[in-house]
């Protein structure tokens, strides 16, 4: 927050147009020069739907949420710097503080990861509670825990990707239970372009 105005940047420094509803709520929440580390997110939405709601105002835009992971402050550990503001003053809350759980054993971490995966999250992040905030760098004190499983599914269709994936295939598959989902196949640009052009062969 600078001079009473709220700004948002991507990790690469690109300015993001903050949705009005979130901007107004952040104004009420933040003090001058406060800085948050977070992302625009709605649980259950895919990345393309979120990007679409940010870039072009539509019926989804006011449903976007801003999830806060951290509050960068030099020379303060995560435990001492993390946001402890009262959010009850906001009537229609689109600002979410990401829950932090303390674990001291590997077994506890694995159980917690399974818990969140069952709730349809990709995985969990592990952070050193005594770590300092690092700007622009991927920190050793902040690691992603993400489980990978291989399964085979029937391909029932596909579509062309958009943006950077324009011309590249995105397959539609189906599980044994009849649940349909989109998946991006492994392969380079040329491989996925060939797959899209020959979609009827799959």
Predicted regions and their residues:
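Nucleic-acid 5′ end/cap handling module spanning
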Residues: 1-14, 56, 74, 91-202
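Covalent nucleotidyltransferase
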Residues: 1-96
């Amino acid at each position: 927050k600078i001079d009473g105005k709220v700004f948002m940047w991507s990790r690469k420094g690109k300015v993001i147009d903050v949705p009005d509803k979130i901007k107004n709520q952040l104004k009420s929440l933040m003090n001058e020069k406060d800085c948050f580390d977070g992302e625009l997110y709605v649980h259950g939405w895919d990345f393309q739907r979120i990007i679409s709601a940010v870039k072009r105002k539509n019926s989804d835009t006011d449903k976007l949420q801003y999830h806060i992971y951290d509050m960068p402050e030099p020379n303060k550990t995560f435990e001492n710097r993390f946001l402890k503001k009262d959010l009850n003053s906001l009537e229609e809350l689109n600002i979410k503080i990401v829950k932090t759980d303390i674990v001291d054993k590997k077994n506890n971490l694995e159980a917690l990861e399974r818990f969140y995966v069952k709730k349809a999250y990709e995985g969990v992040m592990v952070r050193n509670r005594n770590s300092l905030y690092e700007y622009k760098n991927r920190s050793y004190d902040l690691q992603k825990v993400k489980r990978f499983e291989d399964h085979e599914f029937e391909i029932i269709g596909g579509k062309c990707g958009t943006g950077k994936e324009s011309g590249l295939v995105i397959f539609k598959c189906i599980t044994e239970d009849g649940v349909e989902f989109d998946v991006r196949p492994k392969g380079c640009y040329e491989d996925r372009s060939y797959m899209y052009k020959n979609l009827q062969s799959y």
